[in-house]
Amino acid sequence: MDKSITYQDVRGAKHLIEFYDLLTEGYNIDKYIINNTLFRRPDHQFKGLVNLLKPSSIVYDIGAYIGTFSIPMAIEGMKLHAFEGFPDNHVRCKKNTSPYDIINHSCAVSNKQQVVESKFNNCMANGNNEVATINYVIFDDYMAENNLPEPDMVKVDIEGMETLALHGMTNLIENVRPIWQMGYHFKFYSTVEGYPGWVDVKDGGYDFQNFDRLGYLIFNEFGQRVHPAILNYRGGEFIFIPHEKIRRK
């Protein structure tokens, strides 16, 4: 089904967004669009993020799904690159984002480059998914090979795969040092073949305490600064800001 919802930008102007081919079942964000509650979610609050950026800032949306984050950020005047690894979702994302000059990339991110077959394709939960081919890339390499511009902000929402994907973002984390909006899926393990989900540090997963060691400050979904140890015991939405980008009053 299709659905139009209204987004109000930080200046108060209202924009009608059209989403196409929404799923009516499964574990996905579509139901929030259908119920018109998308912009009540903590991961879809944009005012604080926009205030951290300048107009025309470059934003990467990793795990773009169908464009629900990319579109509002583009409306706010940012330049978006949307990365979606699952073919069905990528097709829908391109369709939804076509009016907004968003650049779409069909790739998933991991700690190694490989092509796998997986049923984790369109976030359906009925067990009837067809197997799809997923193209995993090492993100630092993908940026270099495709001559992508360095981002000012990176949003990551990849259902636990952040524990592997960030191993392939060393240059991005340590040298480019963007602001991060992290969908942190703590202990979100997967049993789906071809999609490992969360990997513990002891098993080779990325140690998120590295952000603290590298001088990033951690903020929760309410914009409150929190101790980095919070990442050792709960998930949620977090913003990682390099200390040099904190605006001092």
Language model region names:
Residues 1-101, 128-129, 144-148, 207, ...:
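S-adenosyl-L-methionine
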Residues 1-4, 112-114, 212-214:
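A short, compositionally biased
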Residues 19-21, 107-109, 120, 136, ...:
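Active-site donor-binding loop signature of nucleotide-sugar glycosyltransferases
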Residues 34-62, 104, 115-176, 188-199:
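Short internal loop-to-helix segment that lines adenine-nucleotide cofactor pockets
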Residues 64-66, 87, 111, 158-160, ...:
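Short, glycine/acidic-enriched loop or turn micro-motifs at the edges of active sites
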Residues 76, 142-249:
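Conserved acidic-Pro-Pro-aromatic motif
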Residues 87-125:
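Core alpha/beta nucleotide-donor-binding catalytic domains of modification enzymes
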